[in-house]
């Protein structure tokens, strides 16, 4: 599927010293050619594949007000992007990690949905070899490592203003500070908590199995069915649909899974994004700390792996061959 670019603008923030971020603003929109289309397709692909947080504009959001004016035609897209870059510069300058970069604003359409994507991309140096095998320096946008990105689902925002998920953003590799400054720039607050939704789903599955009094194997088979559906949705880029999941699962007793989860008040949305790390708990146990890292299939608990809660002791019967080989070599060398 291709995306249709409506308007795209590029500006630049340059860090001159510890106190100064200089703006370089374009006087015209970027022309949409093959290179621009390829760049946006790659940025869309990279962004779509990453784990995102959800948010919504605050009532006093200047960016939201300016965007509304732009959408109504009261302000053109270039003017909107130039003013927004100024606000971004002012917010970014408050943080010591500010490095500047290429500021991108792109309005595009994908699968009948209109989006506005805003990103700060790093411009990096590299080497290239030409046809004469000469080496020269080249510059490129580091799209694969983009971590200052937000995207507004314009269709959702305008048709369902009460939504808590029309705005998405990346948390960033350097921790909370990146998302903090970007949320300040957007004047937005976090909305739908995807991890909480996924944790609620796991809790509902466990308690549904409890009510049906399933034995260990039946319970794990049921959890595996839930995981298979959710993982398929994750791999295809689709959300978990509670009604569809319920149809995939055999009813336990008189209630379907959806009826049970609604009656018990888990406050699950009708659909929500899958969280890979949380869903993995359906089929595996994992944890680390104090120099220990463990990861094993849930089916092994009570068969080859035993936990004594009284002494907080985990007993493993039958170690993996590669681990056993390391232990034997280390033991023999210490004698």
UniProtKB/Swiss-Prot annotation:
In its UniProt record, a GO molecular function of this protein is: single-stranded RNA binding
| UniProt keyword annotations, A-Z | Cytoplasm
State the compartments where it is located: Cytoplasm, Nucleoid
| GO terms under cellular component | bacterial nucleoid; cytoplasm
Q: Does the keyword Transport apply?
A: no
Pfam families named among the record's database cross-references: NA37
- What PANTHER family does the record point to? NUCLEOID-ASSOCIATED PROTEIN YEJK, PTHR38772
The record's section on HAMAP family has: NdpA
* NCBIfam families hit by this protein: PRK00378.1
Q: Which family does it belong to?
A: Belongs to the YejK family.
**Identification of the protein by name:** Nucleoid-associated protein PC1_1634
Q: Which organism is it from?
A: Pectobacterium carotovorum subsp. carotovorum (strain PC1)
